[in-house]
Amino acid sequence: MHFGFSYVGMIFLLMLFVPNLIWAENQPEGYEDYAKNENRLLLFLERIGEAAVTCLVLIFRDFNPQGWSTRLLWLAAALVCMVCYELYWIRYFRSGKTMEDFYSSFLGVPVAGATLPVLAVLLLAIYGKNPFLLIAGIVLGIGHIGIHLMHRKELVGEKKPAR
């Protein structure tokens, strides 16, 4: 592992932050009701993972391409996940912006808004041979995907017909 600025990390963070900043003004109706019931442990893990991932992707230059090798396939896979993440957001912003839209699957990926960026981080960690980012990505995934799955479960539970 080599310290140094990662422009790939910066690009990934921009791809994460820009749609989330737009989302802050386009949250689905009722989102706050779900957010106030979030599991505190999952929220803690999510926040720790977010902070660690944000720092780690910027400070290791190993995430930048270093010439051609088959290892670039890991980086390409991470980039594909991020492009799919952007497409997920485009679909959400063009939708009715409901809770169902927000917690929907995309291309068969469940709760895509949480799963795709976490998967991208894990693939980037493998590409950069960075165990710190791998651990941070796992922590982020447990928290972020866990929260989204809980919200999705609540949402699906509300839609079940009464017997």
Where are these regions (language model features)?
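Helix-coil boundary and interhelical linker segments in multi-pass alpha-helical membrane proteins
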Residues: 1-10, 58-74, 123-134
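Hydrophobic alpha-helical membrane segments
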Residues: 80-89, 103-129, 135-144
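A cytosolic-side transmembrane-helix exit/cap motif
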Residues: 30, 92-102, 151-163
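Core segments of transmembrane alpha-helices
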Residues: 47-61, 78, 82, 112-119
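Membrane-interface helix-loop junction between the first two transmembrane segments
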Residues: 21-38
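Transmembrane alpha-helical segments that form the membrane-embedded catalytic/substrate-channel core
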Residues: 15-26, 82-93, 145-150
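Juxtamembrane helix-loop boundaries in multi-pass membrane proteins
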Residues: 34-49, 98-117
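Membrane-helix exit/interface motif
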Residues: 56-66, 87-95
